[in-house]
């Protein structure tokens, strides 16, 4: 069983899909991290969740890298199903987003072990009193996933909304985000095997609504701490900035170096002759 991929269902809206700017952080390249794409497990490359052409850095990559640091064997698989701008009603049992996530998870489970569900959603419900029945809707959705995926005890990690909301840009209208956070926290505290992750101290892009790339790296580390230790994370981690730097400083394997060079050549960042020269230096 140690060789089977341990998979995680990634669901929610744009801050789970990821809108962090790609150029603001070093890429995470790890041959033990795979993502489900076109029905196959592919070596992970960001953006992972391509719901929009502007998709970028999400919390999933640093979550997965932290998993690899803790578990020395095996692979982790990411099942990206987040949809930018989605309200919780769009995730209701039987709706398109819900059905798609169930379908992708079931497909992945043919050759992986579903190990957790990562959820981040609520910005689109942070206005107009939608918080009043948010808990009930979230409960129905998560119970549905656990039942349909035959995983009644699967861990669910739920992230809070950033305190930068309600101030500017696209996030200016999200004035009830604190009330949504109360519901998210209440749900995680009351339900078995559910863990809340606070977004305290995270920063946003200039648009006022999307978590920036560096903060997404931090958020992913917090999500993993919640999953691994089976506890709520109610603030920033100790030495969080340093831990992000450790992610970026990891020495790549030959396979990872080849993958990165191939990607750079395909994107036109290096010439074919440069690709061959640098590939030779890796020993491949």
Enumerate the predicted regions with their spans.
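Cell-envelope and extracellular/periplasmic
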Residues: 1-284
């Amino acid at each position: 069983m140690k060789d089977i991929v341990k998979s995680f269902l990634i669901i929610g809206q744009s801050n789970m899909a990821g809108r962090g700017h790609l150029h603001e952080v070093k890429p995470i390249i790890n041959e033990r991290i795979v993502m489900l794409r076109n029905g196959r497990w592919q070596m992970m490359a960001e953006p992972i969740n391509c719901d929009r052409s502007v998709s970028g850095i999400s919390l999933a990559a640093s979550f997965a890298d932290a998993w690899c640091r803790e578990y020395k064997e095996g692979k982790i698989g990411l099942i990206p199903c987040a949809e930018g701008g989605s309200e919780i009603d769009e995730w209701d049992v039987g709706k398109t987003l819900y059905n798609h996530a169930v379908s992708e998870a079931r497909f992945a489970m043919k050759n992986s072990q579903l190990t957790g569900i990562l959820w981040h959603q609520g910005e689109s419900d942070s206005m107009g009193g939608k918080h009043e029945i948010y808990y009930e809707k979230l409960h129905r959705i998560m119970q549905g996933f656990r039942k349909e995926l035959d995983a009644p005890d699967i861990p669910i990690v739920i992230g809070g909304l950033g305190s930068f909301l309600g101030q500017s840009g696209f996030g200016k209208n999200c004035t009830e985000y604190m009330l949504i956070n109360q519901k998210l926290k209440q749900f995680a505290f009351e339900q078995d095997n559910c863990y809340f992750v606070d977004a305290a101290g995270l920063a946003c892009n200039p648009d006022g609504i999307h978590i920036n790339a560096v903060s997404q790296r931090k958020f992913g580390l917090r999500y993993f701490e919640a999953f691994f230790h089976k506890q709520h994370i109610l603030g920033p981690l100790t030495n969080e900035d340093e831990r992000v730097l450790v992610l970026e400083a990891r020495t790549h394997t030959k396979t990872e170096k080849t993958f990165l060079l191939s990607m750079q050549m395909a994107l036109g960042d290096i010439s074919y002759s440069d690709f061959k020269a640098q590939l030779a230096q890796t020993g491949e």
